[in-house]
Amino acid sequence: MRRPGKRRPELLRTTVMRNNNYGSGKINGYFYVTTPIYYVNDKPHIGHAYSTVIADSIARFKRLSGYSVFFLTGTDEHGLKIEKEADLRGVTPKGLADSVHIKFKELFSELNISYDRFIRTTDADHIRTVQTAFKKLLENGDVYLSEYEGWYCTPCETFLTEKSLMEGKCPQCGRQAVKVKEESYFLKLDKYEKKLLDYIAGNPGFIKPDFRKNEVLSFVNEGLKNLSISRTSFKWGIPVPGDDKHVIYVWFDALLNYLTGIGYEDFIAGKNPDFTQFFKSVNHIVGKDILKFHAVYWPIMLFALGIEPPKTIMAHGWWLTDGRKMSKSLGNVVDPVSLINKFGPDALRYYLLSEITLGLDGDFNIDNFVVRYNSGLANDLGNLVSRTAAMLNKYTGGAVPGADVPEDAAVLKTADDILSGLDARYDDYDFAKILEDIFRFINTLNKYINDSAPWKLNIEDPEEKTVLLKILKTAAVSIYHISYLIYPFMPETSKKINGIFNIKPFDSAGFSVRPEDTAAHCGELFKDGCRISEKAEILFPRIKFEE
């Protein structure tokens, strides 16, 4: 299993019926994708897995499409909530962060998350970035010192208006809000209100899905009040430069990780020419509950810093259990690690991405999980790979028919149709639809094999042998496409398929999805004389409910 590390991804080559610039040594563009950084007050749950798998899938696809990709994830380690949790456990806040952030790294390793940096807000370069940005905004007059009096939700680390309270409780988490009064530095939101509205109007892809845009506009149109961005009532945070009785508000701190991660320090020193290219392409993956921070406060912070706001903020829904939000008190939190241990990482990745349309809430049900696993993965995909490998070994000694054997164009057209619309689907984060189309292709191929019944053909008869070889060639090349198509979503399964069929790895330079001619030459798809493995690993063993 691949263990992620701190690295720049290799630039990969693809010819998925799209133009690219690899012949000239150029790249197709830059792509920067981020997850939220996760609080270290507790171990990761399925919602953390969901956000991260979304980001990982599009990062993998963009790499395959010839983009220079940077994928950032990490942990949010400051704030009153962390300070209180550490006190309850009898440890220091840094000690708590050190122990819990490892659990996120372990989960991401188990899920085969291909991040380029795992950032911690306690990292030295991040602390410098936050203090540099704060100082710049103070010098520009976008930050000023005054006094804050109002409501605050500690679990959500957010300031609340009197109007937003629900019987004195936070409208987001339902817990009791507290009244606070203290000296504070403020960020001028009202100064940039019109500029933000103009940006939203002029960039239709800024907030996805589109219906979330109305929520943001409604909030902004009520009139933005300047935001308190420092606290004096606790100590666990980044000190305000020149005024260390204040610590910087956790959200101001956290949002700036997106600059730290791609080298803001070097950028302002004139040593990072890629910074602007990456940030112009940034896609933030966030939960719907933190959209306000990313679509309102963050763009205004960037306006004040002289940086263009994000290209896209993708706000996904929540995973519920029995229609209720997961919580420790209800005992309904789904542990992703236990699911991975039982079903494997790709089964969880597949379920999370195929079960709901991004932007909407989903209801996790273990019985439904098992049904989807057995029907889609074990029966449809697993059986297809197993039977195709078995037939090749039985009828051709494991040799994939070569260029002299044509494919069935009607079957391969299904793959072509999926490939031709792939870029737009990924840009819309329409993962459920992509997976639906992939599994429709899998079912088409299974039906083709069943209807053709190659096991009834006599390989000693020249005419029947020709038909048989065409079926086997069509199946093998189709599985090549399937392996490519599922790679961003189910990388471990794709690699297993490539191992069985001796396919060139997709995460190495120089691979191609299809030759330009319809009848693919075996050597351009497969390697080492086009001979597959003698034994095909069972990809997804069936699961019984009583297990």
Language model regions located:
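N-terminal Rossmann-like or analogous alpha/beta NTP/dinucleotide-binding catalytic cores
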Residues: N20-Y144, E157
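Basic, alpha-helical terminal appendages of large translation-related enzymes
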Residues: M17-Y30, F70, G74, S146-W151, ...
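Generic structural concept
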Residues: A378, G382, L412, D416, ...
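Short acidic alpha-helical/loop segments enriched in Asp/Glu that coordinate divalent cations
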Residues: M391-E407, D428-D437, Y448-D461
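Short Cys/His-rich "knuckle" micro-motifs
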Residues: K163-M166, V178-S184
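Long, amphipathic alpha-helical stalk/connector segments used for oligomerization, subunit docking
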Residues: T357-L360, F364-N368, Y373, T388-G402, ...
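Structured secondary-structure scaffolds
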Residues: N21-T73, D125-T129, V180-M391, E436-I438
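N-terminal amphipathic/basic-hydrophobic helices that include classical n-h-c signal peptides
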Residues: M1-N21
